[in-house]
């Protein structure tokens, strides 16, 4: 009597997954816009207000709206699943739900797509601040590259891990120079020259792999 509602459930859940992906983009912007990070932020027009009480604020209102609307779309997944079982394939308990669910979820996702497109198109990015934040680690972000360099030269991975970790912890806990400590470490120097260690302390090769995937 009626079309099986699993098709409708698949459609609604697909919308929910898309909404979740867009919300992930928006959530990343929200984190990057935090005062202590500020590596990227939403476009902020000259006459825009970030807060009615605090004139200095530049709240990521568009990103927050995207995240909120995504929850709404994803919330329709439950009634979509509950619509699948029908009495003898002929009752219309699904109808009242679908009259709200399908148009609302569809138009909401359309709105989220438009908002996310505008967010990305106008996104303000601050590479200098990104580099500044990277440098705050004192080179600790390069520990994986040092580890891989040691392994490529024949060191056992677990052993090399301990060598790199002990020098990294000196930086983390005592503020010592990570690079200099590696250069002074007799175990590390058995496998890597000072120049080879220095080559590990370069962020540019770390950007290549993401670009390949994009």
Regions found by a protein language model. Name each.
Residues 1-107, 114-148, 194-204:
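Conserved catalytic-core motifs characterized by acidic clusters
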Residues 59, 154-158, 190-193:
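Helix N-cap / loop-to-helix initiation motif
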Residues 86, 169, 187-188, 206:
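Residue-level marker of structural boundaries
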Residues 74, 169-172, 190:
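A short hydrophobic/aromatic micro-motif that marks alpha-helical segments and, especially, helix-coil
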Residues 212-214:
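Conserved small/polar residues in nucleotide/adenosyl-binding loops
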Residues 123-185:
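C-terminal alpha-helical interaction appendages
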């Amino acid at each position: 009597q009626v079309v099986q509602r699993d098709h409708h459930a698949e459609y609604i859940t697909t919308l929910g997954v898309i909404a979740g992906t867009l919300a992930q983009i928006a959530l990343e912007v929200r984190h990057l816009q935090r005062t202590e990070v500020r590596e990227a932020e939403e476009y902020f027009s000259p006459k825009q207000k970030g807060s009615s009480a605090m004139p200095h604020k530049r709240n990521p209102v568009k990103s927050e709206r995207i995240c909120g609307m995504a929850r709404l779309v994803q919330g329709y997944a439950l009634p979509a699943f509950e619509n699948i079982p029908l009495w003898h394939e002929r009752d219309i308990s699904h109808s009242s739900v679908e009259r709200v669910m399908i148009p609302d979820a569809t138009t909401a996702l359309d709105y989220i797509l438009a908002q996310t497109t505008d967010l990305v198109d106008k996104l303000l990015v601050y590479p200098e601040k990104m580099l500044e934040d990277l440098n705050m680690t004192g080179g600790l972000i390069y520990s994986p590259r040092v580890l891989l360099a040691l392994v490529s030269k024949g060191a056992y991975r677990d052993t090399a891990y301990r060598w790199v970790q002990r020098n990294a912890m000196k930086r983390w806990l005592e503020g010592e120079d990570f690079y200099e400590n590696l250069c002074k470490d007799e175990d590390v120097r058995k496998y890597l020259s000072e120049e080879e260690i220095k080559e590990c302390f370069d962020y540019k090769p770390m950007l290549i792999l993401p670009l390949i995937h994009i």
